[in-house]
Design a protein with these regions (language model features):
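Positively charged, small/polar-rich N-terminal and surface patches that mediate targeting and assembly
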Residues: 1-104
């Protein structure tokens, strides 16, 4: 069993900095933020007959197992994520990884 988990958060564009700050306050060592697009069902959101693709931020955080639940709890408690369907965060075991680069 791995001693680490990869926490993945998918939230509305602009929320990633708040999420990352909350995660660091809860014990994360940092994270990676990437731009992403949602895949809402076609026709669900339209503007003048064109489908609108929701802009998202995706956050990746590698954390020790003991820190995963406190980090997820801190993310869930953010006021910007209180509305149902705002985003999702989950953790998966991180297996077979290595740190890249030479030690200084």
């Amino acid at each position: 069993m791995s001693a680490f988990n990869l926490i993945i958060g998918i939230v509305p564009r602009g929320s990633a900095e708040l999420l990352t700050h909350a995660a660091v306050e809860a014990g994360a060592g940092g994270g990676t933020i990437m731009n992403a697009r949602g895949t809402a069902r076609p026709g669900e959101e339209t503007f003048f007959g064109m489908d609108i693709v929701p802009e998202k931020d995706m956050i990746l955080i590698l954390a020790e197992n003991a820190k995963v639940q406190p980090i997820l709890d801190a993310i869930k408690a953010l006021p910007c994520l209180e509305k149902p369907g705002t985003g999702i965060a989950f953790a998966c075991p991180a297996e077979n990884f290595t740190v890249l680069g030479k030690k200084k």
